[in-house]
Each structure stands twice: as C-alpha cells, then as structure tokens.
C-alpha cells in the first residue's frame, strides 16, 4: 500500500491519473502504531492526512493535514472534507475498536477512498493459539453483540465485528491486517525492551 499510485480500482471516486501520488488518511496516527505508519508513508512520498481527537501527542506532524473529531459521533470535519470533494487513495485505520465507529467511518469515507486498511488483531480468532491460522478460521463472537466495552474477553470479538463493519461498508475494498503482537519504540505496554 505504501508507495502505491492511484489507479482505477472501480471505486466510486473513479480512476485517477496514473502519475497522481498516493494519499493516505490515517485514522488515529499519533498513538503507538500510527506514527510509524505516517513516517514510513511520508518517507516514500505519500501524502498523509490525519483524523483524530488531537489529544494524544498533538505536537506530532505539524506539517501534515489534520482533521479533528471523535469517532463516537463527531466526524464533522471529515464529513465536510468528503462533501467538499476530498479524496484519498486509502485509509489506514489504526484506531478502530468499536464496530459502530468503524461502520460510521467506513460508510462516510466509502465514496472518497479506493481502499480501507483496518489494523485488526490475531485476537479475532476463536483460538489464536492455533498454528497455521488462515482467514477461513473461526473468529470469536460476543454473547451480546451490543457490547462496546473493551476487555480481555471482548477485544478480539470486537475487532472481528469491526472487520465485518468495514467490509459491509466497502465490499471488496478492505484489507484486514491481523498482527499477533505489535511492539517497538513508543510501545506504552513496556513489552519492548
């Protein structure tokens, strides 16, 4: 995805000129994973925009276009940009944990992007300890799908529902990335040594 060029993906935004540089909207972007995504993309000449609350590391990336809001019903700046014709090659969603938020974001952005990349988790699997997992393996489910509180027992099933929400809003245009454990500089969990 990083370093790609826009092309005719069959998206509602239509084909773009072959020499048009890629542009990515990062949902989040200033927490743990997001800055690494932003830095890798900008190093490759990709134009980046950020959408977040502006609360975590707001000093980061002063040169990058920013949209402020909250995924919990405060998408106004992003909605205005989409209505004004703003388009991106892709979205990288580093801050999706609640299916309703992912559904709302993906639905809003569907006409404005070619592809949606959702950072999910290996925890989506009903049995993440299984060797040789594939996309065909069963995902965990919540007894009550209206649950939005993140806990050890709900995290994986919520991420699975987020994947489904993005895919429902943008059929055929979603990539779900299911990392096992993300560690590295800036990790607030102290797993990185």
Predicted regions and their residues:
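Conserved sequence/active-site signature of Rossmann-fold short-chain dehydrogenase/reductase
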Residues: 124, 182-184
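Active-site regions of enzymes building and remodeling cell-envelope glycoconjugates
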Residues: 61-70, 134
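N-terminal Rossmann NAD(P)H-binding glycine-rich loop of SDR-like oxidoreductase domains
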Residues: 23-44
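NAD(P)-cofactor binding segment of oxidoreductase domains
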Residues: 86-142, 160-165
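N-terminal Rossmann-fold cofactor-binding loop
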Residues: 50-55
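N-terminal export signals
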Residues: 1-13
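Active-site Tyr-X1-5-Lys
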Residues: 144-176, 185, 191
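Conserved Rossmann-fold cofactor-binding substructure of NAD(P)-dependent oxidoreductases
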Residues: 67-88, 100-101
């Amino acid at each position: 995805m990083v370093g790609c060029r826009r092309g005719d993906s069959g998206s509602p935004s239509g084909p773009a000129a072959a020499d048009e540089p890629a542009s990515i909207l990062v949902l989040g972007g200033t927490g743990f994973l997001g800055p690494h995504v932003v830095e890798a993309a900008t190093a490759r000449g990709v134009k980046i925009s950020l959408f977040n609350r502006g609360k975590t590391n707001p000093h980061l990336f002063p040169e990058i276009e920013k949209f402020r809001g909250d995924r919990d019903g405060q998408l106004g700046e992003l909605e205005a940009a989409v209505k004004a014709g703003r388009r991106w090659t892709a979205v990288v969603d580093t801050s999706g944990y609640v299916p309703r938020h992912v559904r709302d974001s993906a639905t809003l952005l569907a006409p404005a992007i070619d592809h949606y990349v959702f950072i999910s988790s290996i925890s989506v699997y009903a049995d993440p300890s299984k060797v040789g997992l594939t996309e065909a393996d069963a995902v965990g489910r919540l007894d009550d799908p209206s649950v939005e509180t993140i806990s050890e027992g709900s995290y994986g099933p919520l991420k699975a529902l987020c994947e489904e929400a993005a895919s429902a809003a943008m059929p055929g245009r979603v990539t779900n990335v299911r990392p096992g454990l993300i560690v590295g500089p800036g990790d607030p969990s102290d797993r990185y040594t």
